[in-house]
Amino acid sequence: MASLKLTLGVFAIALVGVWVPAPASAQNSPYVIAASDAASALPGATVTANDVDESITTIKKRVDEVNVLFIATDRHGKFVRNLNQTDFSIFDDHKPVESILNFRRETDLPIELGLLMDVSGSVQGRFGFEKDAATGFLQHIIRPGYDRAFVVGFNKESRVTQDFTDKMPLLAAGVQRLNNGGGTALYDAIYKACKDKLLHDQFDHPVRKAIVILSDGEDNQSETTRAQAIEMAQRAEVLIYAISTDDSGLILRGDKVLEDLASATGGRAFFPYKMKDITRSFAAIEDELRSQYDVAYKPSGFDADGRYHSIEITALKKDLQVRARRGYYAPRQ
């Protein structure tokens, strides 16, 4: 198979500071149901982030350095964990980058995670099981003293039921306080979570930021557009993972929305049909968050123009697939 070329993306921000190696991984106890292979993702449409809020503040550190986390898999979908810097090339706005400044595998980087659960009336069928599975996921992935998470329930409005914490009893209580009913403002929830919780430069060490969404993807209340939600996630360097709550077995409009949100930010969407597949989806997300690579590079002829820039990563190994963000927004000076 010819080498694969994917258009990906990152937000222009350097991960700087001293990283202290993590303690041993959290307990290996299973979730509600033992984890196995994740459900397959659906192909999604591409959305261009235009006409967005120009008042958004871009985080600036070293302006000429771009940093991206990415996943590599083989043709069977299994993670490839032995890549070298010579196994891929990077293009920024279709031009070869000037230099690669850093490349390493990130397995224990601290996680800052947002759990966003759709509590609208359309998702009530499996809501109780989903809350239990989400609680199991948080218990398994959050390492006290190292990782943190927050919990948000959204219908026509978003409500934080538990702010950032590493304490599992508080997170579990935050999930159990969620009650469903009402319309759905998915894009507003993503935008607000990224802007209020994950955008600001509040971390004094490298972290990986992610949002896990449980929803059917049907938005009927948001003032924010999908493009604006995607841009805010890209500016905040947030990976979006989505687990569909639709159990019809059909490919619906909401499924394509979830796929697009995930692929635009370097995450992944899952479409579990059976309840046990929800648990498997959570397990796959955890595995992926522990199987990423981090590369930092200097673009050729970098210009702090505030524009959106695309990234292309060309895998040089046969049958290798790479997944990351579609693009980033340069700082403006």
Regions found by a protein language model. Name each.
Residues 1-6:
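Positively charged n-region of N-terminal signal peptides that target proteins for export
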Residues 9-19:
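Bacterial N-terminal signal peptides
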Residues 19-26:
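Sec/Tat signal peptide C-region and signal peptidase I cleavage site
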Residues 26-333:
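Scaffold/interface architecture of coatomer-like assemblies
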